[in-house]
Amino acid sequence: MAEAASISQGIAERYATALFELSKETGALKTLETDIDALKDVLAGSPDLGAMIASPVISRGDQAKAVAAIAGKMGLSPLMTNTLALMSEKRRLFALPQVLSALAGLIAEEKGEVTAEVTAATKLSAAQAKKLAETLKAKVGKTVKLNTTVDESLIGGLIVKLGSTMIDTSVKSKLASLQNAMKEVG
């Protein structure tokens, strides 16, 4: 299974690099970024679309028609539309989520940004998110973009993952540490 994941990641990185370089050459990085965000939103909101791109049962022709219709309806750039058509023709649409993630990473790197994965017990307010982004920016020296998710099981606090660093200030982890300490004592 790990081998399949690395194969699809390799495919995704090749498509992402090619699309990124072409967009950079033509000065269309902002358009590409808009397309990526739109596609991520559509994939997140449509389990049927996710199933369609992952299904080996659906023919190339049907996938190509569906992708062309979706791209047209969304108003995606010609470069993204052509890339989706090529991926459909080559039966590589299953790697689309990884392509989008790799593209977002390349664009962020180009802009000097890093992305922090933040898991909070409750939804962060705009002021809290801004303060956290500023604090992380001071720490890493780059603009920080936050991807936030809510996990009520944390009880309180945050878990921040930035690159290979993880900061866990959640009540859940504090309670687990206390529980382990109590087991050692008694």
From Swiss-Prot:
F-type ATPases have 2 components, F(1) - the catalytic core - and F(0) - the membrane proton channel. F(1) has five subunits: alpha(3), beta(3), gamma(1), delta(1), epsilon(1). F(0) has three main subunits: a(1), b(2) and c(10-14). The alpha and beta chains form an alternating ring which encloses part of the gamma chain. F(1) is attached to F(0) by a central stalk formed by the gamma and epsilon chains, while a peripheral stalk is formed by the delta and b chains. HAMAP family: ATP_synth_delta_bact (MF_01416). Keywords: ATP synthesis, Cell inner membrane, Cell membrane, CF(1), Hydrogen ion transport, Ion transport, Membrane, Transport. F(1)F(0) ATP synthase produces ATP from ADP in the presence of a proton or sodium gradient. F-type ATPases consist of two structural domains, F(1) containing the extramembraneous catalytic core and F(0) containing the membrane proton channel, linked together by a central stalk and a peripheral stalk. During catalysis, ATP synthesis in the catalytic domain of F(1) is coupled via a rotary mechanism of the central stalk subunits to proton translocation. One of its GO terms (cellular component) is plasma membrane. PANTHER family: ATP SYNTHASE DELTA CHAIN (PTHR11910). It is a peripheral membrane protein. It comes from Fuscovulum blasticum. It is found in: Cell inner membrane. GO terms for molecular function: proton-transporting ATP synthase activity, rotational mechanism. Belongs to the ATPase delta chain family. The keyword Membrane applies. SUPFAM superfamilies: N-terminal domain of the delta subunit of the F1F0-ATP synthase. This is ATP synthase subunit delta. PROSITE patterns: ATPASE_DELTA (PS00389). The keyword Cell inner membrane applies. Its main location: membrane.
